[in-house]
Regions:
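Conserved Class I S-adenosyl-L-methionine
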Residues: 201-259
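Conserved alpha-helix/loop element of class I SAM-dependent methyltransferases that forms part
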Residues: 38, 53-70
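A short SAM/SAH-binding and catalytic strip from SAM-dependent methyltransferases
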Residues: 138-150
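Class I SAM-dependent methyltransferase SAM/SAH-binding core
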Residues: 75-77, 81-128
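N-terminal auxiliary segments of SAM/dcSAM-dependent transferases
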Residues: 1-31
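A short glycine-rich, Lys/Arg-flanked "PGG" loop and its adjoining helix->strand segment in the class I
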Residues: 152-164
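Conserved beta-strand signature within the Rossmann-like core of class I S-adenosyl-L-methionine
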Residues: 166-172
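A short acidic, Gly/Pro-enriched loop at the edge of an enzyme's catalytic core
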Residues: 127-139
Length: 259
């Protein structure tokens, strides 16, 4: 799940995520992450309309609240279907929030679905951000960077568009064999690490809570004859198994600052 040949990565993204957008748009699926839940359970107050997405929202909430976003200029790289962007704009009150994604269909969906003051969506590449230097106070990236062919280039771009003192708020996973290289890339980035922690347990718990919702989505988007196979071999199912203690995947949450 978390490693693809770099030569094919962006082609895979363009096909899979555009296909997913077309299939899931009518189901109002605005979050694509696995979810997150703590023990004891988090007490994040949500509106009735947000409640069905609680566990995906909680991953955004936990990642984004590592820094103050009120009154800040925020960029999210890999914004997916825009649910996290909408939630953070409504609750953390940044001055502006820009969601960027490589999937043009996803960006068009975001523009139709999320119409809020200060929120905009842009099609673009994480490894070549279409913004001037020092444009943002914070950059958010959640469960997306494992697909970038040149992760170190992405980190350099993050540092470039951040103002001095700005924050990079980040959560993602890597296969066990890739963790060492991941950590080296992060250590070599032109950013200072503020905090890091493993969140395998919390993500697995969130996935458990999200199970029925994702089964519903799969059933609605998949022909009946294929539903059993898709459920068994869906990436989320494999990731859930890989996130077990001592398993094949390590999921971590980070906060960095630009000095």
């Amino acid at each position: 799940m978390f490693k693809l040949n770099a030569q094919f990565t962006q082609g895979v993204q363009k096909f899979i995520y555009r296909h997913a957008t077309r299939k899931l748009e009518t189901e109002n699926v605005v979050f694509l992450n696995y979810g997150y839940e703590e023990d004891p359970a988090m007490d994040v107050p949500l509106s009735a309309s947000d409640e069905p997405d609680r566990y995906s929202i909680q991953l955004y909430h936990s990642t984004a609240t590592q820094a103050e976003l009120d009154g800040r200029r925020v960029l999210e790289v890999g914004c997916g279907h825009g649910g996290g962007a909408s939630y953070l704009v409504r609750t953390l009150h940044p001055t502006s929030y820009t969601g960027l994604d490589l999937n043009p269909d996803g960006i068009e969906y975001c523009r139709r679905r999320h119409n809020l003051p200060g929120l905009e969506f842009t099609h673009g590449d994480a490894q070549n951000l279409p913004f001037t230097d020092q444009s943002f106070d914070a950059v958010i990236n959640i469960e997306s960077s494992h697909l970038y062919p040149q992760f170190s280039v992405f980190l350099t771009e993050v540092a470039r568009v951040l103002r001095p003192g700005g924050h990079f708020l980040y959560a993602d996973a890597r296969s066990a064999q890739d963790v060492a290289g991941w950590k080296v890339a992060l250590a070599n980035a032109p950013l200072r690490m503020v905090s890091e922690r493993g969140i395998n347990v919390e993500v697995r718990r969130g996935m458990e809570k999200n199970l029925e919702r994702w089964r519903y989505v799969i059933d609605r988007a998949t022909p009946a004859i294929l539903r059993g196979v898709i459920r068994r071999f869906a990436p989320a199912q494999r990731a859930y198994e890989d996130l077990r203690s001592g398993g094949a995947v390590e999921y971590r949450m980070y906060s960095f600052t630009k000095v």
